[in-house]
Amino acid sequence: MADTMVAHMDRHNKIDVEISEDDKRLTKLCSLKKKAINATNKFKHSMTKKGRRHSRVACVSIVDEIDTEELQAVDAFRQALILDELLPSKHDDHHMMLRFLRARKFDLEKAKQMWSDMLNWRKEYGADTIMEDFDFKEIEEVVKYYPQGYHGVDKEGRPIYIERLGQVDATKLMKVTTIDRYVKYHVKEFEKTFNVKFPACSIAAKRHIDQSTTILDVQGVGLSNFNKAAKDLLQSIQKIDNDNYPETLNRMFIINAGCGFRLLWNTVKSFLDPKTTAKIHVLGNKYQTKLLEIIDANELPEFLGGKCTCADKGGCMRSDKGPWNDPEIFKLVQNGEGRCLRRSLSGIEEKTIFEYNNETKKKCEPEETHKQSAAEMEKKFIDTNVDAAAAADWPTKLNKAEKNPTDLKDVYSAVNPLERKGYLYGSVMALLMGIVGVMRLTKNMPRRLTEANVYSREGSAVYQDGVTVMSKQEYIAMVKKITDLEEKCKSMEAQAAFYMEREKTLDAALRRIDQLELQLSETNKALDETMTRQHEIMAFIEKKKKKKRKFLLF
């Protein structure tokens, strides 16, 4: 009994000492309590705010047009990438993953292989830092001999890329730069397009933009425009674009195409995918009406039938006109706006706000006190040396305090003086953050095993020992399906052989065209020499006639 009394007195003295020390610090903690309350109120306000879109910033509203089926495919693709550790945070973008899926016709394994190759290429090529590391000083000279660049946007907000292939001088181009340097410049421009131009267009159009409209002017295109070096350059650029920046073309207009080009295109497009050919429109010299249906006249250069001249910037091909030149839009792009937040299938409000709060906390709440987590607040306001009797009495007094706010003083007196409003808000914050964190973790966990267990129980008999038995009907159906697949494979192999023959025929036709163009060039040269010789002979005959007349006069 005496020991119990001594222990009780020691504990009582300990509490008295703590209370006296805490009273001295109570005034200092008032400001911390107020800051914690303000931070909690702001968090609660963000939880109840309505009308927030899936955007990283509240002030820019961007429409995301991905449908449910595509979102399901992206979600499955994302889980596969996470399992194989192929998803850096920089590339955790559902639009980027969707482009790779579309490029491989939603074949998960092929898209994953393409994604892996892209990551390896970016690491080896240094694409992530090429905007800062590479300086293309010869750009002014290059544009003279290879007129190309972005100019304006179409009516749907996509940037317009223009190339005047008929004015390409490959010989002079290779004198001012090299193939490697131009390819690096091309990659740098593509990175700039994804990091600056597409987000700027998305902000201006208020819808997600990650594709462009291309115009190729082929007037005057011939063998003289493209030597071997130029062909190698175009092949290198095309390979990089197809392998690492897929599905960035929305539509392409090939203008000023002659009869020969159209005939060749009709032959070539039979070997291309129908979706690809649907994007390409081959037009003659009456293309203005078609372009103006897609592009506003003020956004289209004058030499293509529009009204824009960009006289103050040295011409349309040098102006780089577009919303990315707007200072306000460019500032928003630099702040990380113009990008859609990764969407999920569940649509849980807490998860979206949690991600939004983590990503924009520094912009929306610049005060240093708002950077404290719920766990840190709880550590500041909770003392571990709480008397057991006081802790047991806490729920009862808290219920009374909820009914009568004036009893809050009694509630706080049951525990350490540090545990007042800070404890309440800290506990709520910790609980809320814990729930949201668990929801995020469980949602992003791989679901292959779960799905396998679910689907294995549908349409089959499972005994208690876990052995699955296949019925006779299921076996027959499976054999029939395998037979059908084998027939389809054989049919595809036959079609592949047929396409190989057509490709060989096309290659032979292209070689024949090259030979004919070479013969035509030689014939023109011989004809010019013959004409020159004929003029010399005529001049000689005329000279002889004059001498003969003089002789007859004498």
Swiss-Prot record:
Q: Extract the Pfam families matched here.
A: CRAL_TRIO (PF00650), CRAL_TRIO_N (PF03765)
* GO annotations of cellular component type: Golgi membrane; plasma membrane
What InterPro entries does the annotation carry?
CRAL-TRIO_dom, CRAL-TRIO_dom_sf, CRAL/TRIO_N_dom, CRAL/TRIO_N_dom_sf, PI/PC_transfer
Compartments reported by the entry: Golgi apparatus membrane; Cell membrane
> What are the UniProt keywords, alphabetically?
Cell membrane, Coiled coil, Golgi apparatus, Membrane, Protein transport, Transport
Provide the membrane topology annotation: Peripheral membrane protein
Q: Which SUPFAM superfamilies match?
A: CRAL/TRIO domain, CRAL/TRIO N-terminal domain
Lineage top rank: taxon: Eukaryota
Any coiled-coil regions, as ranges: 472-534
Sequence ranges assigned to domain CRAL-TRIO in this UniProt record: 138-312
One GO biological process term is: protein transport
Question: What PANTHER family does this protein's entry cite?
Answer: CRAL-TRIO DOMAIN-CONTAINING PROTEIN YKL091C-RELATED, PHOSPHATIDYLINOSITOL_PHOSPHATIDYLCHOLINE TRANSFER PROTEIN SFH2
User: Could you tell me what this protein does?
Assistant: Required for transport of secretory proteins from the Golgi complex. Catalyzes the transfer of phosphatidylinositol and phosphatidylcholine between membranes in vitro.
Q: Which family does it belong to?
A: Belongs to the SFH family.
Please identify the protein, giving its name as recorded.
Answer: Phosphatidylinositol/phosphatidylcholine transfer protein SFH2
The species is Arabidopsis thaliana
